[in-house]
């Protein structure tokens, strides 16, 4: 199989010698589901067979040593953040973000409700295998009188450029590189 050159083009991952974007294969992230085949990781794309979808695409590969692969993170808790009543005072919940990859990443935190939810620190840089403890705070509010159904924290991260200082830069997220996201819904117990 020829060497592939990975590039980002208008939101689609494409590969050399490919006649359609790799996104058509619904292959986006680790554990991606491909036609009748579940992959264990991004490097497994290099083993994909020729002529998927009736020969429309000759190759759909992502090189194993690709610079465009974004490192993975883990969060503790992994699926949601829970705040317990009463809500007359400010609550703080700590979450841990771990860079489980072999690359330095920059991360930024977004919230869907900036009046009620805050995160400290809201952004930063993590070296490989490094972790940071984030304080997620919930300001006092009238529970039951305000809509809380769509509240969530979103962790966004991307690889830092090679040789970059360990200082967060917003422009890392504004270029054409891959930015990953993990949503952590907020649950409010009465």
UniProtKB/Swiss-Prot annotation:
Sperm. It is found in: Cell projection, Pseudopodium; Cytoplasm, Cytoskeleton. SUPFAM superfamilies: PapD-like (SSF49354). Gene3D superfamilies: Immunoglobulins. Its main location: other. Residues 72-189 form the MSP domain. Keywords: Cell projection, Cytoplasm, Cytoskeleton. InterPro entries: Ig-like_fold, MSP_dom, Nematode_MSP, PapD-like_sf. GO terms for cellular component: cytoplasm; cytoskeleton; pseudopodium. Around 30 MSP isoforms may exist in C.elegans. Central component in molecular interactions underlying sperm crawling. Forms an extensive filament system that extends from sperm villipoda, along the leading edge of the pseudopod. This is Major sperm protein 32. It comes from Caenorhabditis elegans. The gene is msp-32.
């Amino acid at each position: 199989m020829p060497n592939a050159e990975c590039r980002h083009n208008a939101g689609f991952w494409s590969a050399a010698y490919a006649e359609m974007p790799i996104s058509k294969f619904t292959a986006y992230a680790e554990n991606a589901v491909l036609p009748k085949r579940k992959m264990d990781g991004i490097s497994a794309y290099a083993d994909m067979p020729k002529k998927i979808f009736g020969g429309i695409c000759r190759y759909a590969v992502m090189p194993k040593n690709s610079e465009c692969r974004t490192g993975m993170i883990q969060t503790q808790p992994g699926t949601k953040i829970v705040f317990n009543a009463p809500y007359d005072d400010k609550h703080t919940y700590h979450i841990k973000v771990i860079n489980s990859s072999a690359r330095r990443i920059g991360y930024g935190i977004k919230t869907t409700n900036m009046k009620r939810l805050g995160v400290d620190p809201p952004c930063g840089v993590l070296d490989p295998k490094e972790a940071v403890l984030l304080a997620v705070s919930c300001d006092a509010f009238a529970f039951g009188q305000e809509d809380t159904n769509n509240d969530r924290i979103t962790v966004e991260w991307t690889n830092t450029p090679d040789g970059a200082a360990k200082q967060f830069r917003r422009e890392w997220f504004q270029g054409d590189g891959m930015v990953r996201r993990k949503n952590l819904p907020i649950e409010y117990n009465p």
